[in-house]
From Swiss-Prot:
The protein's required cofactors: FMN
Function: Catalyzes the conversion of dihydroorotate to orotate with NAD(+) as electron acceptor.
HAMAP family referenced in this protein's UniProt entry, alphabetically: DHO_dh_type1
Pfam family, one: DHO_dh
Active site residues according to the UniProt entry: 130 (nucleophile)
Key words of the record: Cytoplasm, Flavoprotein, FMN, NAD, Oxidoreductase, Pyrimidine biosynthesis
Gene giving rise to this polypeptide: pyrD
Keyword flag NAD: yes
Entry note: cofactor: Binds 1 FMN per subunit.
Catalytic reaction annotation: (S)-dihydroorotate + NAD(+) = orotate + NADH + H(+)
Source organism: Halalkalibacterium halodurans (strain ATCC BAA-125 / DSM 18197 / FERM 7344 / JCM 9153 / C-125)
CDD domains associated with the record: DHOD_1B_like
Protein name: Dihydroorotate dehydrogenase B (NAD(+)), catalytic subunit
Pathway(s) this gene product operates in, as recorded in its UniProt entry: Pyrimidine metabolism; UMP biosynthesis via de novo pathway; orotate from (S)-dihydroorotate (NAD(+) route): step 1/1
Length: 305
């Protein structure tokens, strides 16, 4: 086994690096830059039952050390994703993680049941940051019992492992992680974006048409590290860590905190080569730090104390 290889439920990865959902389209957008087979896995853009056109513009705003986005889960819908987007990735020899979203539990179940049966889908990533229209618009990921019920229903129909993507916009992320673990989650991905806002000084209104948006990029990295450090000590399922990763050192820091693999998000927008660059840099940094196998350092920051 390669010194960079990691094994997670449903995901045999040649290295621990995957592009994060929502920052890589459906993969083909980056195929002109480098060979996608270089990646450890690919997490595709969120898929919903019906096509979604997303929020009105502006949907993106720059911030110091990051960005705000309120895209609104724009995607071509379940059937199109299966027939076209996933079909285009059929020749890519890399595990595919399908991110799924919805407005009701039934929406999630319908997408999960269909997309998990596609041959090249190896795992699902459950986006629980979506508003639950049956519960007054409260996000699925802010109430442990609601998140657990959703996880349980998706697990019931999925033929592949299910990773629950946790929102940081909660009072106790450990409680949330434990709730979805009890409900059958095979793994976690964390963290999703932090809720934020920017104002236009001339118009005296929010820059984003949606008002608020998700903050991502290096600005949220310390929050992600802290949450992964806490959660990894409280659950027994693997974690895909994300939140501001842009270098090999960032990857090693996330894994020392307790992540078993990582996803690179916002950095793809500023450097489309960031993922293969990190992969190529990792062995050198591991040599410098005396690390033989990358999987051996997972949780090293707390396992040694």
């Amino acid at each position: 086994m390669s010194r960079l290889a990691v094994e997670l439920p449903g995901l045999s990865m040649k290295n621990p690096i995957m592009p994060a959902s929502g920052c890589f389209g459906f993969g083909k957008e980056f195929a002109g830059f480098y060979d996608l087979n270089h990646l450890g896995a690919i997490a595709i853009k969120a898929t919903t039952v019906e096509p979604r056109f997303g929020n009105p513009t502006p949907r993106v705003a720059e911030t110091h050390s990051g960005m705000l986005n309120a895209i609104g889960l724009q995607n071509p819908g379940l059937n199109n994703v299966i027939d076209n987007e996933l079909a285009r990735l059929a020749d890519v020899d890399v595990p595919i993680v399908a991110n799924i979203a919805g407005s009701t539990v039934n929406d999630y179940v319908e997408v999960a049941e269909a997309i998990s049966r596609v041959d090249n889908v190896h795992a699902l990533e459950l986006n629980i940051s979506c508003p639950n229209v049956k519960e007054g618009g409260i996000a699925f990921g802010t109430v442990p019992d609601v998140a657990a019920q959703l996880t349980q229903e998706v697990k019931r129909v999925s033929t592949v492992p299910v990773y629950v993507k946790l929102s940081p916009n909660v009072s106790d992320i450990v409680e949330m992680a434990q709730a979805v673990e009890r409900a059958g989650a095979d793994g976690l991905s964390m963290i999703n974006t932090l809720l934020g806002m920017r104002l236009d000084l001339k118009r005296r209104t929010p820059i984003l048409a949606n008002g608020t948006g998700g903050l991502s990029g290096p600005a949220i990295k310390p929050v992600a590290i802290r949450m992964i450090y806490q959660v990894s000590q409280a659950v027994s399922i693997p974690i895909i860590g994300m939140g501001g990763i842009q270098s090999a050192d960032d990857v090693l820091e996330f894994m020392l905190a307790g992540a078993d693999a990582v996803a690179v998000g916002t950095a793809n927008f500023t450097d489309p080569y960031v993922c293969p660059t990190i992969i190529d840099e990792l062995p050198k940094r591991m040599d410098e730090l005396g690390i033989e196998r990358i999987a051996d350092i997972v949780g090293g920051s707390w396992k040694q104390s």
